[in-house]
UniProtKB/Swiss-Prot annotation:
Molecular-function annotations in GO: ATP binding; ATP hydrolysis activity; magnesium ion binding; P-type potassium transmembrane transporter activity
Residues the record marks as active site: 324
Protein's name according to its UniProt entry: Potassium-transporting ATPase ATP-binding subunit
Keyword set, alphabetical order: ATP-binding, Cell membrane, Ion transport, Magnesium, Membrane, Metal-binding, Nucleotide-binding, Phosphoprotein, Potassium, Potassium transport, Translocase, Transmembrane, Transmembrane helix, Transport
Membrane topology: Multi-pass membrane protein
Record-stated family: Belongs to the cation transport ATPase (P-type) (TC 3.A.3) family. Type IA subfamily.
EC id: 7.2.2.6
High-level lineage: Bacteria, Bacillati, Bacillota, Bacilli, Bacillales
Quaternary structure annotation from Swiss-Prot or TrEMBL: The system is composed of three essential subunits: KdpA, KdpB and KdpC.
Reaction equation(s) it catalyzes: K(+)(out) + ATP + H2O = K(+)(in) + ADP + phosphate + H(+)
One Pfam family linked to the record: Hydrolase
Length: 697
């Protein structure tokens, strides 16, 4: 009997292994394709019309052109050998190519995601309901906003819309990657459906909410492709600073021959170009775009769609997070918290009958009762319940339970309903039932009475339980200097209990939608940036007001349009990860900028003595690296300047390691690692390269 099971498990495991191996092979193939495409694009981006968008690398490209021309038409007064000019020009060319490759590689990852999304946009037909009731089949591309469409089991939802009739299970794996279907129904906050998803059961009628080219998938494709990627304010500000530095150094280098002529010696044009390239911040200039694109890519990998890079950056500067209690801090499902016996009954008796009444109950509450009883090691006869007839919960009876084969009737449900049922069986009501029910209600819980025939045994205290690990996560946010505010419709007593248990900094009890806007504005008036999550139409104003609004994909169209981020997994706690990604983006940009500028110190000690030692022998004192020769020093500095860009591409793409800590601690850590490291690494790198170059010249 056991042999077939073992074989089946083996086959399942083998098929699972093969599937994983296929995925790994596909991933490697895709990575190779992305790299090949990036290499081609790095050459295509040499077009001056493209390069001028990056002023720093554009200057390097001009330097390449000048030195390349000098390789064939050298100056008559030049004392530099011909091979030096061509070597410098090649190094500058590869410097530009490496920078272009970094940007193209980041863009390629986004385009790969866009291609997979395009595959989900299949040619489908829609059953459109005309005003006269006639059903006409048309192509999804012909649908317009406000068209009414019927979608049956097994059919693809043709475009974005909202359910106006019916209820169905929808497979959203093409969008979210989550295989479990979700329930969509008319009315409420779960009526929004997305084009490209599949109805797997029942039938729904939807009204189309977008025109062709404006659907959710279309927006996703446009965003991840980065075709219309706008630079963020911080990126523009940093780019302006770097461009200004480049302009200053350009003026210095152009005017330098005037001073050298006065001192009685000349500097070759190729050496001046090399000096300029070593002075300007080419490292961060070559990686800046890649860092921004990769930051958006990391958010997308978390199944979060950011409407702009500005939203991701804002997440990194967040000071306050507004969180709903239900579904975010707590499970949102009432879970069994404790058992309260009445009269002379015992907890074991209450647990036994509560479990028997819940064995066949598939609701979250019913399952939580079984889990609680098992955790408390209370024994009960499961087979007895399984052999009985399950009585499902109904709005009319407000009870559920089981009728056992021996005629025993077990019920659990609302206090008033069960008391009335017990009385109808001829039973009496213990005096402390209502007292204990009131206690649970005042605590913010839900009381369920457990009864068998004409006898009440006790109550189940259902509580909206705080998710595991929330206290630790809020502590991490606190270390980052971020305040958490919990909004809940519960009374102040219950809200205070949940807030204390979860570890949030503040709470707003009996909170209405308009109260959330007031909380957000109050924080913003203090100069703070605020993030919040939401899924309902009533959350839309607050999502729009927040600096970072994360809407749930399962929510309404209004909520998604108001937010600047959408979580495809509909997990409200993901706002914490989004904040982390935003901080990682800002830290990566800041760290590499620090590293790039610190690099220049070592380059100064390499190239300045090489330029002036012959005319000013005292400058030899600055040659602290004891480089082989002036030409070797210049080439070594240029080679390091070029090679460091591809070496830092993985760091720019992945982002620097981020640990929750205060801003001051973070600044000190990064200055130590990337500031001091940015000084030490070039000294070592240039010296090693010089030793190698010295073997050939």
């Amino acid at each position: 009997m056991m042999r077939p099971v073992v074989v089946k498990e083996k086959r399942v495991n083998e098929s699972h292994i093969h599937a994983v191996e296929d995925e790994v092979r596909q991933a490697k193939t895709m990575d190779r394709d992305i790299v090949k495409h990036a290499m081609k694009q790095s050459v295509a981006k040499l077009n001056p019309k493209v390069m001028i968008k990056n002023p720093i690398m554009f200057v390097v490209e001009i330097g390449f052109v000048i030195t390349f021309i000098l390789s064939f038409f050298p100056s008559h007064s030049s004392s530099i050998p011909g091979w030096f000019n061509i070597t410098v020009s090649l190094i500058l060319l590869f410097t530009v190519l490496f920078a272009n490759f970094a940007e193209a590689l980041a863009e390629g990852r986004g385009k790969a995601q866009a291609d997979s999304l395009k595959q989900s946009k299949k040619d489908v037909f829609a059953n459109v309901v005309k005003e006269n009731g006639e059903i006409v089949q048309v192509s999804a591309t012909d649908l317009r906003k406000d068209d009414v469409v019927i979608v049956k089991q097994g059919e693809m939802i043709p475009s974005d819309g909202e359910v106006i009739k019916g209820l169905a299970s929808v497979d959203e794996s093409a969008i979210t990657g989550e295989s479990a279907p979700v329930i969509k129904e008319a009315g409420g906050d779960f009526c929004s459906v997305t084009g490209g998803t599949m109805v797997v059961s029942d039938e729904i009628t939807i009204v189309i909410t977008s025109n062709p080219g404006e659907s959710f998938i279309d927006k996703m494709i446009s965003l991840v492709e980065g075709a219309a990627r706008q630079k963020t304010p911080n990126e523009i500000a940093l780019n302006t600073v770097l461009t200004s530095l480049t302009l200053i150094f350009l003026i210095v280098v152009v005017t330098l021959p005037i001073f050298t002529n006065y001192l009685g010696f000349q500097i070759d044009t190729a050496v001046l170009v090399a000096l300029l390239v070593c002075l300007i911040p080419t490292t961060i200039g070559g990686l800046l775009s890649a860092i921004g694109i990769a930051g958006m890519d990391r958010v997308t990998k978390f199944n979060v769609l950011a409407m702009s890079g500005k939203a991701v950056e804002a997440a990194g500067d967040i000071n306050t997070i507004i969180l709903d209690k239900t579904g975010t801090i707590t499970f949102g499902n009432r879970m069994a918290h404790t058992l309260l016996p009445v009269g002379n009954e015992t907890i074991e008796q209450v647990g036994k009958w509560a479990a028997i009444s819940s064995v066949l109950d598939e609701t979250p509450e019913g399952r939580s009762v079984i889990e609680y009883v098992q955790a408390k090691s209370i024994s009960y006869n499961r087979e007895l319940a399984e052999q009985g007839e399950f009585i499902p919960f109904k709005a009319e009876t407000r009870m559920s339970g089981v009728d056992l084969q021996d005629g025993t009737k077990v019920r659990k449900g609302a206090v008033g309903s069960v008391i009335e049922w017990v009385r109808s069986q001829g039973g009496t009501i213990p005096k402390d039932v209502n007292q204990k029910a009131d206690f649970i209600s005042k605590e913010g819980g839900t009381p369920l009475v457990v009864a068998v025939d004409n006898r009440i045994y006790g109550l189940i205290y259902l509580k909206d339980t705080v998710k595991p690990g929330m206290r630790e996560r809020f502590e991490q946010l606190r270390q980052m200097g971020i305040k958490t505010v919990m909004c809940t419709g519960d009374n102040p007593l219950t809200a205070a209990t949940i807030a204390k248990e979860a570890g949030v900094d503040e709470f707003v009890a009996e909170c209405k939608p308009e109260d959330k806007i007031a909380v957000i504005k109050a924080e913003q008036d203090k100069g703070k940036l605020v993030a919040m999550t939401g899924d309902g139409t009533n959350d839309a104003p607050a999502l729009a007001q927040a600096d970072v609004g994360l809407a749930m994909n399962s929510g309404t169209t209004a909520a998604k349009e108001a937010a600047n981020m959408i979580d495809l997994d509909s997990n409200p706690t993901k706002i914490i990860e989004v904040v982390g990604i935003g901080k990682q983006l800002l830290m990566t940009r800041g760290a590499l900028t620090t590293f790039s500028i610190a690099n220049d110190i070592a380059k100064y000690f390499a190239i300045i003595p090489a330029m002036f030692t012959l005319a000013i022998p005292q400058m030899e004192a600055l040659n602290i690296m004891k480089l082989t020769s002036p030409l070797s020093a210049i080439l070594s500095a240029l080679l390091f300047n070029a090679v460091i860009i591809p070496l830092l591409i993985p760091l720019a793409m992945k982002g620097i390691a981020y640990k929750p800590m205060s801003s001051n601690a973070l600044l000190g850590r990064n200055l130590l690692i990337y500031g001091l490291g940015g000084v030490i690494v070039p000294f070592i790198g240039i010296k090693v390269i010089d030793m190698i170059v010295g073997l050939f010249i």
